């Protein structure tokens, strides 16, 4: 049996080896206009380094990144590293006016952070206006050198990441500005995309199709990212099953399925064995549209998986998968409820903060306004809220800067409600019109460092109930349960999965239903929680947690960097 001194020496040696294995990467991300042609029309779009999608970042767990953002575009810009915990480095999280002021044209800012205790697929995207329509890319986090994936079958190789997106035949910034000006719903997208290509089912798009060469008999790792702005997506690969092994950079128990569901912001890693007759097979994606009577992009995007066989003539028919109906909530629920965490959850036994948040769309009444400003139903303006508070971004400084300097006055208030102001039948078919109008404000909810937090996310049917993908910055959380109708603590708490719940950073709150999440507030700073349908965050479906510093340096937010942009 080794002595205590020997054990300590071995532990120190292991720690030093671990630190030595970690690396630091430096990248320059230059924002600039680039001309691209889709659907027979050329557009000048915002890109990073002229690439669309943007550069793929590939690191190992424990590595650090320095990203020098140089803005040579014509819009303010910030970048968000979606799903990265940003432990104590909230200044690099990216949402404009929440953790930083935007990087203005002609300016630059260096994002600095370490990716620790996370493996799998994350991504990065613009967090200003609707610029993430074209400014996005993959962030791949592999196990440390010498460590294999925790899969029974190791992949022969990894394919290029599969980024699902949306394309507008106009400037997406103009789309959201028009909606904001008029109070109406924004124009829907003109196409869905795979790796920025619509696929050959669209008019004037026969050559705009992503192709993935594959080898017969191999098992490959495929990484899916839903980078679309406003569309949840069903995804299927003709003739092939997919075994889910990770979601949002958290490993899952293997789950074999022919269908994936990804909400905007979510990622899914799957293993696929290419064991079908040599040929070409479509990967297809189309909308899961849960809101009744709401327009959506009902097109289908495709990519081709090509075995490359000698007899695989280009004129041969390409196998097409069968996708569910657009509104198939049963199929959507079946996928999400089958996900389980790979290991037993490290779940806090106590709950210090028990919160109940209603999430949904509403309407602002118009008074003394012109018809041009009231383009919503019956002369209203569209709105959205959490607990009837429609979130408003500050403009004079960021929330985190105001908090750090101890000067919240005029920027935010720390009075976000723990419960909705009025209890009602949240999912009723006819909700009283008196409950449709939220209150606008910039409110945060304060959490003590280390507190165990449980949030019931309750969807409402105030105006067109639908599935809401809720993303929490700075944290992963356990999804304990989800269900339809109104959450009933007495009946539904017993349904909680406390053994192996999936861990994610974005949860789909079912249409006219609920989801329960739990996390420990161990990361000081200001952390946005919002719907990842950009139309909804534009309307105010967001709030922020303000997590106080703990004890000592390692439980406190780092000092702001010297190049932090000013408003």
UniProtKB/Swiss-Prot annotation:
It is an enzyme of class 1 (oxidoreductase). Cu cation 4 binds at residues 468, 531, 536. Cu cation 1 binds at residues 80, 471. Binds 4 Cu cations per monomer. GO terms for cellular component: apoplast. Residues 30-146, 158-310, 415-551 form the Plastocyanin-like domain. NCBIfam families: laccase. Belongs to the multicopper oxidase family. This is Putative laccase-17. The lineage of its organism: Eukaryota, Viridiplantae, Streptophyta, Embryophyta, Tracheophyta. The gene is LAC17.
């Amino acid at each position: 049996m080794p002595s205590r001194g020997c054990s300590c020496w071995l532990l120190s040696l292991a720690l030093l080896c671990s630190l030595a294995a970690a690396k630091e990467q430096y990248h320059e991300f230059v924002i600039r206009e680039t001309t691209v042609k889709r659907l027979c029309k050329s557009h000048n779009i915002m890109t990073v380094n002229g690439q669309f999608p943007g550069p793929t970042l590939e690191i190992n767990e424990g590595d650090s990144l320095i990203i020098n953002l140089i803005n040579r575009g014509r819009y303010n810009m910030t970048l968000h590293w979606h799903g990265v915990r940003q432990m104590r480095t909230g200044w690099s999280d990216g949402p404009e006016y929440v953790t930083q002021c935007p990087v203005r044209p002609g300016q630059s800012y260096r994002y600095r952070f370490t990716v620790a205790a996370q493996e799998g697929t994350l991504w990065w995207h613009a967090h200003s206006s609707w610029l993430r329509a074209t400014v996005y890319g993959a962030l791949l986090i592999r196990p440390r050198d010498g460590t294999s994936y925790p899969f029974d079958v190791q992949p022969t190789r990894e394919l290029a990441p599969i980024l699902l997106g949306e394309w507008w035949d106009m400037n997406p910034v103009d789309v959201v500005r028009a909606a904001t000006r008029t109070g109406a719903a924004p124009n829907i997208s003109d196409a869905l995309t795979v790796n920025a290509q619509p696929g050959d089912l669209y008019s004037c798009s026969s050559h705009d199709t992503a192709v993935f060469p594959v080898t017969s008999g191999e098992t490959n790792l495929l990484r899916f990212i839903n980078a679309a702005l406003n569309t949840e997506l069903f995804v299927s690969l003709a003739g092939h099953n997919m075994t889910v092994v990770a979601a949002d950079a958290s490993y899952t128990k293997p789950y074999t399925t022919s269908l994936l569901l990804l909400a905007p912001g979510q990622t899914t890693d799957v293993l696929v064995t290419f064991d079908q007759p040599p040929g070409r097979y479509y990967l297809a994606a189309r909308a899961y549209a849960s809101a009744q009577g709401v327009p959506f992009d009902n097109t289908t995007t495709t990519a081709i998986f090509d075995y490359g066989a000698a007899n695989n003539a280009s004129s041969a028919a390409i196998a097409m998968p069968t996708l569910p109906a657009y509104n198939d909530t049963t199929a959507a629920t079946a996928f999400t409820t089958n996900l389980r965490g790979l290991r037993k959850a490290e779940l806090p036994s106590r709950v210090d903060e028990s919160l109940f948040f209603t999430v949904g769309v509403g309407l602002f009444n118009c008074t003394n306004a012109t018809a041009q400003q009231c383009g919503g139903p019956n002369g209203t303006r569209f709105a959205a809220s959490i607990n009837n508070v429609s979130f408003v971004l500050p403009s004079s400084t960021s929330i985190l800067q105001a908090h750090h300097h101890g000067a919240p006055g005029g920027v935010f208030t720390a009075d976000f409600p723990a419960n909705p102001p009025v209890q009602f039948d949240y999912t009723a078919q006819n909700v009283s019109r008196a409950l449709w109008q939220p209150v606008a404000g910039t409110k945060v909810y304060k959490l003590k460092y280390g507190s165990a937090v449980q949030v019931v996310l309750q969807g409402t049917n105030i105006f067109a109930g639908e599935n809401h993908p809720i993303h929490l910055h700075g944290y992963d959380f356990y999804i304990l349960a989800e269900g339809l109708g109104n959450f009933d603590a007495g009946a539904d708490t017993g349904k909680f999965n406390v053994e192996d719940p999936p861990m994610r950073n974005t949860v789909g709150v079912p249409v006219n239903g609920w989801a329960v999440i739990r996390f420990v507030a161990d990361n000081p700073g200001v952390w946005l929680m919002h719907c990842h349908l950009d139309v909804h965050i534009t309307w105010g479906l967001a709030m922020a947690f303000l997590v106080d510093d703990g004890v000592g340096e390692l439980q406190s937010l780092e000092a702001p960097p010297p190049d932090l942009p000013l408003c």
